[in-house]
Swiss-Prot record:
Residues 319-388 form the AGC-kinase C-terminal domain. Activated by phosphorylation at Ser-218 by PDPK1. Autophosphorylated on Ser-377, as part of the activation process. May be phosphorylated at Thr-356 and Ser-360 by MAPK1/ERK2 and MAPK3/ERK1. N-terminal myristoylation results in an activated kinase in the absence of added growth factors. CDD domains: STKc_RSK3_C, STKc_RSK_N. This is Ribosomal protein S6 kinase alpha-2. Its EC number is 2.7.11.1.
Amino acid sequence: MELSMKKFTVRRFFSVYLRKKSRSKSSSLSRLEEEGIVKEIDISNHVKEGFEKADPSQFELLKVLGQGSYGKVFLVRKVTGSDAGQLYAMKVLKKATLKVRDRVRSKMERDILAEVNHPFIVKLHYAFQTEGKLYLILDFLRGGDLFTRLSKEVMFTEEDVKFYLAELALALDHLHGLGIIYRDLKPENILLDEEGHIKITDFGLSKEATDHDKRAYSFCGTIEYMAPEVVNRRGHTQSADWWSFGVLMFEMLTGSLPFQGKDRKETMALILKAKLGMPQFLSAEAQSLLRALFKRNPCNRLGAGVDGVEEIKRHPFFVTIDWNKLYRKEIKPPFKPAVGRPEDTFHFDPEFTARTPTDSPGVPPSANAHHLFRGFSFVASSLVQEPSQQDVPKAPIHPIVQQLHGNNIHFTDGYEIKEDIGVGSYSVCKRCVHKATDAEYAVKIIDKSKRDPSEEIEILLRYGQHPNIITLKDVYDDGKYVYLVMELMRGGELLDRILRQRCFSEREASDVLYTIARTMDYLHSQGVVHRDLKPSNILYMDESGNPESIRICDFGFAKQLRAENGLLMTPCYTANFVAPEVLKRQGYDAACDVWSLGILLYTMLAGFTPFANGPDDTPEEILARIGSGKYALSGGNWDSISDAAKDVVSKMLHVDPQQRLTAVQVLKHPWIVNREYLSQNQLSRQDVHLVKGAMAATYFALNRTPQAPRLEPVLSSSLAQRRGMKRLTSTRL
């Protein structure tokens, strides 16, 4: 009698198979014996020298990342030992609920992870057991899984897909070198770190070859990704992984699966026929690689030969890949996930992350259960420390907030609101105090009826790790307002501080411009334009006045470059497929950012603004002066300022955006490159209030002009809709 199985998936971390009750226990047992599975599970002790043995008391539970009948996956923080403060994913398996096959898979996953050490494979740091449970302590990867990216966020090109496939090929080759067949390759099992590099996870279905031909015979994996030899159960080798590799490549390039019928039976029939209609929009190299991977006979499949992965690496599709640089992570990923604090779980299912993290002791399965998992303990040889950050409270409604807090905690439960810091058209900024720690922050309170804060939040999450961009600490939503908790800028506004400074020189002005231009170049290179870079949005983190403490703030008008369907675009996609008028608009917005920096630089050097004489100038007068492109570069401070400074100012304030310097050109200008030789003589300035009033009048005049139409992200894509019934919907920002 055939053994019936039902698949249960806990997203991103763990897949197990729950066995339906079979009418014939003997047939089930014989099937297990055929697959080389025994009841006794013996796992050797593995404690590396210099590290203490771990136990559950050493880990603080922060959030639930996933849950099933077998147990849970938690986000945890180590509270003792040399790696105290480090965040991990803790997989907790209840011995009593694990069937024999699942116990074997748990043992197998632990064994494989303990043996594997590779940049593109999730790392096991500890393994241990109590009377009722097994524990695996793994890397916590904040970038979510590749499926989310494929379906909801980014437009990929062949060049981008090539990057992910190349990293994946190196990971598979490493496993194959250890005699391991992965057998469950699919986007859900490919996680992204915060930089966008991949790590494959979920080794519950992986298997070391069992017979002298290095073949395995069990029927496992996700049906659409199975190789023909897995479907027909005639035994499979590592070559089966290269078929799945081809399925993943096809899906990433086309948005659909190559072999998918209306039901399981039809899908299996299509796989066994291995006949594929090749999309003609794919490059000749991509088509060639797919044909070489989709060979029905595994012996003829690319990667199955004596050279193994070298056959794949030599294929023309990968001709542009530098494999050594790739392994060292020196090639920049095409996409950077939006991640904030280390403990953020934006890319995990809110059904799980909203739950209170509790780990019950677990009921021992039987008197001799402990012996079934002999020697489960393991400690990694090296533990990389990350800076510990405070755990911040929790809240509701906006998708991002769902991920952080659940449904029942409000901003005022965790923070006490203090005085106003600043007031804008759509928001107010206040000082606030975290009740549990007395730490001070700034909270930006946005009226949702006037502005959708999603774009601002996503930009801050994705790029707020830059040292000169304000850091988003937490997000709350009460339905009417969104609360963005950010670091408090104690040093005040840049221009205010400079104008009140007793001594300010041309050399200091160049240091300030260098820091801000470098930050804008970073944003522009990522397809982000600020569009509101007035001096009041450039602040100091502290009272030092050091350029390193400068932060770019208020991304309320900022935009990420998106396709017409609202998806983000990789740099490669932008260069090859974006309409000229879209790029022109993006270039115009970037040029406006540089123009704003030109206004700031002019004011720092001259001591007054270029286009407004004071707060009483009318918008019409100011706009007329801006349109003429005329401003003074002689008299006053200008008589002692270098020609290089005048040159960079005039090129940043050029009336034609296309002739204006870009941020990267500003950084390469001699005035910046040779700034250590600039004068340190004190520059004079007008009255502080007069200058600030003139600056405010300038931006008031500019903001009266119509804003460009805003592109909003779509909530889903065809790929997400196609696979929507197969898994829970992923959250997008």
